[in-house]
Amino acid sequence: MKAREANFDGLVGPTHNYSGLSFGNVASEKNQANQSNPKQAAKQGLAKMKALADMGLVQGILAPQERPDVHTLRRLGFMGSDANVIEQAAKQAPKVLAACCSASSMWTANAATVSPSADTADGKVHFTPANLTNKFHRSIEHETTGRILQATFADKNHFAHHSALPAVEHFGDEGAANHTRFCHQYDEHGVEFFVYGRHAFDSRYPAPKKYPARHTFEACEAVVRLHQLTSDKVVIAQQNPDVIDQGVFHNDVIAVGNKNVLFCHEQAFLNQQAVYKELTAKVGGNFKIIEVPTSAITIEDAVTSYLFNSQLIEMPNGETLLILPEECRNNERVWAHVQTIINAKQGIDKVQIFDLKQSMANGGGPACLRLRVVLNEQELQAVNQSTLMNDTLFNRLNTWVDSHYRDTVTDADLADPQLVVESRAALDALTQILDLGSVYAFQR
């Protein structure tokens, strides 16, 4: 049965702010305490989603988390009314409050790992929410993420949902930001490519020294087992620890792949040639590797431009489109090399630029904002149709953003108890628009 790749982008939440919470993410740290614009951020994301839908692609939406997360603050000892909890946290633990206000769930590449039915033993699409243990502000996402995924992909005849891996560093799982699937046609049994930063149970292997390796080898193995994948169609590779120490905190900051194309930097992986050899053997056929040398683009340029944090998409006419953030065009070296790649006709046919400045300032480019889900025709029909982008939904969501979102949010605004009221009102309305049911704690 014919299958297509759908992209489910994260909707930016009403509390989008720059609190510098992500150690190892250069942009996040650099822009700490800057004023954010949640309304603009949400609309930039919606514009990208609508553009892809207008290209004839399947584009879905994943709802944001409930923030401020008063429930987590209560678990941490803050008591009284919601307003009292916010007030106490602002005075006693402002960094904890900031973490509980993060809108980082917009980056749905970290929401989960997804395996299509063509790859799994039971013939279902499998979802495992990422535990994101390395960062507190993200580690509190996975329960709600699981409920949102189950409300979006509800049909048990087609979709299998797992719990997140144990929430300890040994099984640190960053989701699809460290996962790519290669194939020749989407409906064929593909090769799933997992990338990790370190071994948790074996210190003999190299690891980064400056910044944390967020994803473990053991987490990759666990997801392979949960999703019932076969070993001859799986490749597990280690990310180069040296580039993690230069700000490449996920593999999708240094590599992107789709179908039979891998686009990556020459320093992306440990033992890179061996990785290429295994991928080439397992994918078979015409597997294309587009490698960018350091002499053309440094790691620093890759990180600041987010060249590889791009979307590699097959268009309805069969051409391959590379979706890039505007920052790539603003970097002369990067933009020149992009033109070289296009002109060489190595497997990427066209480029499209999007303005995602609000997300980029927190360290999230086009690839961060989307979760890829390969679906056959029956599975696509089984998806919650209210979450699929079209003209009507685009207009409804823009009106919703105008009604509920602030133009600016600063660190000081996070202490405003009214932010809880506004955010819950927004999310309550959103669950009705997207037909999600009661996925949030305040609704349960």
UniProtKB/Swiss-Prot annotation:
Which molecular function GO terms apply here?
Answer: N-succinylarginine dihydrolase activity
Summary of subunit composition and partner proteins: Homodimer.
Q: Which family does it belong to?
A: Belongs to the succinylarginine dihydrolase family.
**Which keywords fit this entry according to its UniProt record?**
Arginine metabolism, Hydrolase
Task: Give any single GO term for biological process.
Answer: arginine catabolic process to succinate
The protein's matches in HAMAP family, at most eight in alphabetical order, are given as: AstB (MF_01172)
**UniProt key word Disulfide bond:** no
One Pfam family hit: AstB
Gene3D superfamilies tied to this protein: Succinylarginine dihydrolase
Q: What does the UniProt record say this protein does?
A: Catalyzes the hydrolysis of N(2)-succinylarginine into N(2)-succinylornithine, ammonia and CO(2).
Q: InterPro entries in the record, alphabetically? A: AstB_sf (IPR037031), SuccinylArg_d-Hdrlase_AstB (IPR007079)
This protein's source sits in the domain of life called Bacteria
**Name of the coding gene:** astB
Q: Which residues bind substrate?
A: 19-28, 110, 137-138, 214, 252, 362
**Record's protein name:** N-succinylarginine dihydrolase
- Name of the top EC class for this enzyme: hydrolase
Against SUPFAM superfamilies, the record matches this protein to: Pentein
Q: Which reaction does it catalyse?
A: N(2)-succinyl-L-arginine + 2 H2O + 2 H(+) = N(2)-succinyl-L-ornithine + 2 NH4(+) + CO2
Organism, as annotated: Photobacterium profundum (strain SS9)
What residues form the membrane-spanning segments? none
